[in-house]
């Protein structure tokens, strides 16, 4: 049996290693481009001639631009230097069609200085929507005082169905890049990702590619979007420019395609935005480290869930285990899952929380020795009996909870009242979930104390699932890294560091109360070594 479990774990680890190596090879293929070896099919860079260029940005309500009619010039950068970084904010006139839930497009031209883009055969251009459709985020108000009178009147006029309808939002940022590497491409093996951004011309006997213009869509974040009202005649637009290398350009193209694919597979704008934030707000080298950390996090998540389920599946007795701690973990994980769901947290955080909540519900059934009997549509619950040793454990458990209740209940009630008076929420449900989860996060470590107290009274930690604890500890330290990378509520960040402290206390107890290898444990295993127990003073 042991061999079967070991083989399965080895298989999972082996698949994980192959996946990591394959991903590294794919990433290398993305950022590395083979240069031309010198034969006649080389494609030279037009920028190597240092032409005088001009950058022009126009806006229009049409997705296809045939002429210069019905366009507004919003930015004109004469004597444009591709090596110089800049950022400028301009006011854009919003047409009536756009204010009525229409779309507005930005046309970005890179052309020769002093020549209109429509008259320049060597111009390059890209189009990008300046608006997007999204359901507006519910406004937060004080639940006791209510919102401002104007907000309440506007909300009453708005039909209920309109609250869930997507409306036009303004993208206040337009990020531009030009690839500045004087790279000579091999015409026989052009990268497909870059080729769709390339425009080539014939100059004499050589083929040259015009400057590669790129619009960074990953920089458009949901948190920056502005709802377009019918009174919005002008809106600000920040146009920023920076040069980009070929390797980074190819990586960015692939990331944009990946985000687009997520949206095509049904990911919401919010979930796709969380993925964008990882790439935009993080250094690329740190991002590579994050990938490996995330991969190991998924592996340890799987191994922790597997060993935890295996431990509880075999467990027939609750000797040495705090039932109150099991009930608390179940309550806290369910509340945390509902809280993360209400906060629209990213899927990498939400999915493991949901799986953990389901496992904790199953563990409560095991801890209470509960049997569910279905009689038609109505379930009947039967509870098993406890042995003398289990009842003694329950006494220690109840004693620890009695002391904790004197501190816990006043703090939780006081915190809920304070947040109701001073913090704005979307709804009463949001306040209730936030109050529960703040109690879970802020005082959750107190509910871990009953198990520590039971360990102290029994002078043993042999009854704990140490394999699952070890994998969870690895993930706790990984969560400390993710707390600064992935978007999550502040209270969830603090909880990551709280778990570090608790695990260190468990390690201290494991050192203080070594496993008695001379006795048979609950799995029927025994060892020959005689333990050297360290002295302990009550």
From Swiss-Prot:
One of its GO terms (cellular component) is endoplasmic reticulum membrane. It comes from the Eukaryota. It is a multi-pass membrane protein. The keyword Transport applies. The keyword Transport applies. GO terms for biological process: apoptotic process. It catalyses: a 6-(alpha-D-glucosaminyl)-1-(1,2-diacyl-sn-glycero-3-phospho)-1D-myo-inositol(in) = a 6-(alpha-D-glucosaminyl)-1-(1,2-diacyl-sn-glycero-3-phospho)-1D-myo-inositol(out); 6-(alpha-D-glucosaminyl)-(1-octadecanoyl,2-(9Z)-octadecenoyl-sn-glycero-3-phospho)-1D-myo-inositol(in) = 6-(alpha-D-glucosaminyl)-(1-octadecanoyl,2-(9Z)-octadecenoyl-sn-glycero-3-phospho)-1D-myo-inositol(out); a 1,2-diacyl-sn-glycero-3-phospho-(1D-myo-inositol)(in) = a 1,2-diacyl-sn-glycero-3-phospho-(1D-myo-inositol)(out); a 1,2-diacyl-sn-glycero-3-phosphocholine(in) = a 1,2-diacyl-sn-glycero-3-phosphocholine(out). GO terms for molecular function: phospholipid scramblase activity. Its main location: endoplasmic reticulum. It is found in: Endoplasmic reticulum membrane. Keywords: Apoptosis, Endoplasmic reticulum, Glycoprotein, Lipid transport, Membrane, Transmembrane, Transmembrane helix, Transport. It holds the Pfam family CLPTM1. The chain crosses the membrane at residues 11-31, 285-305, 325-341, 403-423, 429-449. Residues 1-10, 306-324, 424-428 are cytoplasmic. Glycans are attached at residues 91, 101. Residues 32-284, 342-402, 450-538 are extracellular. Belongs to the CLPTM1 family. Scramblase that mediates the translocation of glucosaminylphosphatidylinositol (alpha-D-GlcN-(1-6)-(1,2-diacyl-sn-glycero-3-phospho)-1D-myo-inositol, GlcN-PI) across the endoplasmic reticulum (ER) membrane, from the cytosolic leaflet to the luminal leaflet of the ER membrane, where it participates in the biosynthesis of glycosylphosphatidylinositol (GPI). GPI is a lipid glycoconjugate involved in post-translational modification of proteins. This is Lipid scramblase CLPTM1L. It comes from Bos taurus. The lineage of its organism: Eukaryota, Metazoa, Chordata, Craniata, Vertebrata. The gene is CLPTM1L.
């Amino acid at each position: 049996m042991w061999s079967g479990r070991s083989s399965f774990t080895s298989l999972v680890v082996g698949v994980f290693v192959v996946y990591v190596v394959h991903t590294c090879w794919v990433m290398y293929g993305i950022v590395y481009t083979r240069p031309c070896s010198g034969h006649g099919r080389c494609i030279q860079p037009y920028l190597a001639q240092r032409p005088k260029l001009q950058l022009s940005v126009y806006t229009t309500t049409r997705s296809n631009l045939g002429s210069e009619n019905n366009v507004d010039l919003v930015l004109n950068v004469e004597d444009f230097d591709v090596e110089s970084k800049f950022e400028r904010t301009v006011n854009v006139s919003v047409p009536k069609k756009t204010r009525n839930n229409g779309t507005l497009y930005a046309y970005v031209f890179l052309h020769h200085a002093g020549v209109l883009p429509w008259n320049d055969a060597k111009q390059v251009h890209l189009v990008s929507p300046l608006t997007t459709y999204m359901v507006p985020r519910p406004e937060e108000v004080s639940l006791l005082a209510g919102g401002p009178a104007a907000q309440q009147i506007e909300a009453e006029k708005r039909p209920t169905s309109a609250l869930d309808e997507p409306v036009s939002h303004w993208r206040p940022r337009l990020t531009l890049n030009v690839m500045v590497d004087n790279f000579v491409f091999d015409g026989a093996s052009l990268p497909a990702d870059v080729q769709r951004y390339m425009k080539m011309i014939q100059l004499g006997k050589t083929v040259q590619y015009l400057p590669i213009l790129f619009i960074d869509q990953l920089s458009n974040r949901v948190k920056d979007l502005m709802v377009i009202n019918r009174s919005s005649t002008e809106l600000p637009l920040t146009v920023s420019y920076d040069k980009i290398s070929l390797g980074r350009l190819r990586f960015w193209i692939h990331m944009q395609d990946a985000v687009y694919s997520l949206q095509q597979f049904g990911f919401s704008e919010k979930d796709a935005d969380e993925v964008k934030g990882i790439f935009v707000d993080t250094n690329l080298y740190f991002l590579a480290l994050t990938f490996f950390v995330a991969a190991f996090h998924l592996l340890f998540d799987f191994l922790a869930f597997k060993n935890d389920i295996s431990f509880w599946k075999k467990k027939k007795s609750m000797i040495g285990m705090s039932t109150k701690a099991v009930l608390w973990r179940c309550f806290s994980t369910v509340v945390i899952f509902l809280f993360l769901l209400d906060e629209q947290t990213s899927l990498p955080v939400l999915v493991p929380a949901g799986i953990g909540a389901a496992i904790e519900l199953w563990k409560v059934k095991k801890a209470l020795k509960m049997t569910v009997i279905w009689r038609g549509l109505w379930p009947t619950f039967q509870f098993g009996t406890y042995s003398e040793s289990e009842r003694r454990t329950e006494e220690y458990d109840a004693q620890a909870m009695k002391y904790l209740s004197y501190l816990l209940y006043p703090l939780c009630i006081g915190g809920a009242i304070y947040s109701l008076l001073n913090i704005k929420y979307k709804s009463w449900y949001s306040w209730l979930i936030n109050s529960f989860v703040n109690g879970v996060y802020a005082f959750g470590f107190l509910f871990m104390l009953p198990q520590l107290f039971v360990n102290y009274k029994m002078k043993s930690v042999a009854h704990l699932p140490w394999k699952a604890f070890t994998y969870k500890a690895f993930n706790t330290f990984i969560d400390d890294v993710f707390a600064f990378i992935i978007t999550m509520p502040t209270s969830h960040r603090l909880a990551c560091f709280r778990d570090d402290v608790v695990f260190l206390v468990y390690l201290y107890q494991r050192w203080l109360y070594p496993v008695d290898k001379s006795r048979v444990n609950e799995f029927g295993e025994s060892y020959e070594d005689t333990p050297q127990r360290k002295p302990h003073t009550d």
